[in-house]
Design a protein with these regions (language model features):
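Terminal targeting signals and extreme-terminal segments of soluble enzymes
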Residues: 1-139
Length: 139
């Protein structure tokens, strides 16, 4: 079986289809399933703000990536997705070196997926909550 024949859930869990950007930011897939995606980010020093907390842009990238994994796990082979809208509410900040995001698809249509996500510190403190709309591009 080639990598393209393996279901998206398995490919994502194995890191097969993850861009270099994903690894550059210290991300790793913890869970890639039809019901939920979980991505962990070991925050590189360069992603800390001048005052110590993890930069909000790094949190946004983690949330966007985690939602992308959640949507990809629900897609038929060959379909692609792209972020249309991402609304993040930052609740708190984290100075911890690990941030974990979870995401799930709320509604999956033919061309659009509505999703939600949250990012937490490794200790479980809520950092941000997000809603997103992803476009679905089928072959």
């Amino acid at each position: 079986m080639t990598a393209r024949e393996v279901p998206a859930v398995e490919r994502l869990a194995a890191g097969v289809e993850l861009p270099e950007f994903f690894h550059y930011l210290g991300m790793s897939v913890v869970k890639a399933a039809a019901d939920e995606a979980v991505v962990r980010m070991q925050v590189p020093k360069g992603l800390l703000s001048p005052y110590g907390p993890v930069h909000g842009g790094a949190i946004a990238a983690l949330i966007d990536t985690t939602i992308g994994v959640a949507v990809a796990c629900r897609m038929p082979h060959g379909a692609r997705t792209a972020t249309h809208e991402l609304n993040i509410n930052y609740i708190s900040f984290s100075k911890e070196p690990v941030v974990i995001a979870t995401a799930r698809v709320i509604r999956l249509g033919r061309t659009v997926a509505h999703c939600e996500s949250e990012a937490r510190s490794e200790a479980g403190d809520l950092i941000a909550k997000a809603l997103a709309t992803f476009g679905i591009f089928r072959k």
